[in-house]
């Protein structure tokens, strides 16, 4: 009853913004996020702020990707929503969930946690995290595209109006009125992505066959193996922390005098797949004065031999 199927994290975030944000935030209120947010957890709150007259306030980071001292105090009695990434999709940094959540709840704010980058890589317990909402996408964790999840505390979901209207989300329809289905069906209008849900179930079983703690430990081992070698290259600059324990399988970097798209193209020509661009986090890039970067991502199928091949090409760029 607390798990709603959606298309992806973006749709989950929009559901929260429209069904909770627009109905519970007003002029004079604050929405607090970090500057590192994916656009799905940023543009949504821009929209809510614009529509309600609320203020959107940012918590800023130091050069290592940690929250600057005192930024948490921006969460005050006027704050209604605190939304942030569990793990940054650019920096790989895990934000201090416990500290931020306790601060938010102490002033009566709800916590929206973007788990798109964390869920594939570490064990997740929403009760332990004590967030009010949690979202993630299946395609980032070996499921097919087009399936996502929204977790919400039942009392919040029950009080929220539907996001999409139509078939399956109704209880009874008359000419002028309609009543809505129980949870979670109230938020699952139309034909569901049954194939996607089955693929997500299979993906979860697959990942749990290894153990999420084992996957997290293996990725940390991979990062510890390759990160110092990248940092040692004088023409390459890693964004954020250089502590392997703080990268969670993601290393974003720039190369002197070479555009990230060109870096990615050169690597691709050698059979190495990376991501280049702003990674749907333009305010973070602007904050660090980096318009784009190349991102190396590791997962349970990555081998040290793959990283060696990556490094040899990177040396020549």
Predicted features along the sequence, with ranges:
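Pyridoxal 5′-phosphate
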Residues: 1-317
């Amino acid at each position: 009853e607390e798990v709603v199927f959606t298309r992806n994290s973006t749709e989950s975030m929009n559901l929260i913004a429209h069904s909770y944000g627009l109905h519970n935030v007003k002029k004079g209120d604050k929405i607090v996020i970090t500057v590192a947010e994916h656009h799905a957890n940023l543009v949504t709150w821009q929209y809510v702020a614009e529509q309600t007259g609320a203020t959107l306030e940012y918590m800023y980071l130091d050069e290592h990707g940690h929250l600057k001292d005192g930024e948490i105090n921006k969460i005050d009695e006027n704050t209604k929503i605190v939304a942030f990434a569990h793990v940054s999709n650019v920096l790989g940094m895990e934000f201090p969930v416990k500290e931020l959540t306790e601060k938010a709840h102490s002033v009566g704010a709800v916590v929206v946690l973007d788990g798109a980058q964390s869920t594939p890589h570490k064990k997740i317990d929403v009760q332990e995290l004590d967030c009010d909402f949690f979202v993630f996408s299946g395609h980032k964790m070996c499921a097919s595209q087009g399936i996502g999840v929204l977790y919400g505390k039942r009392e919040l979901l029950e009080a929220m109006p539907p996001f999409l209207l139509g078939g399956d989300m109704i209880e009874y329809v008359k000419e002028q009125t309609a009543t809505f289905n129980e949870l979670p069906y109230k938020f699952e209008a139309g034909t569901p992505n049954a194939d996607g849900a089955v693929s997500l179930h299979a993906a979860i079983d697959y990942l749990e066959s290894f153990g999420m703690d084992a996957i997290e430990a293996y990725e940390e081992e991979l990062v510890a193996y390759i990160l110092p070698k990248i940092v040692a290259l004088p023409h390459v600059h890693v964004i954020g922390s250089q502590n392997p324990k703080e990268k969670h399988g993601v290393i974003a970097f720039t190369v002197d005098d070479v555009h990230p798209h060109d870096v990615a193209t050169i690597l691709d020509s050698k059979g190495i797949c990376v991501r280049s661009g702003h990674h749907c986090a333009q305010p973070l890039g602007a904050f660090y004065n980096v318009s784009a970067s190349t991102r190396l991502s590791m997962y349970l199928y990555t081998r040290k031999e793959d990283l060696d091949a990556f490094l040899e090409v990177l040396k020549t760029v």
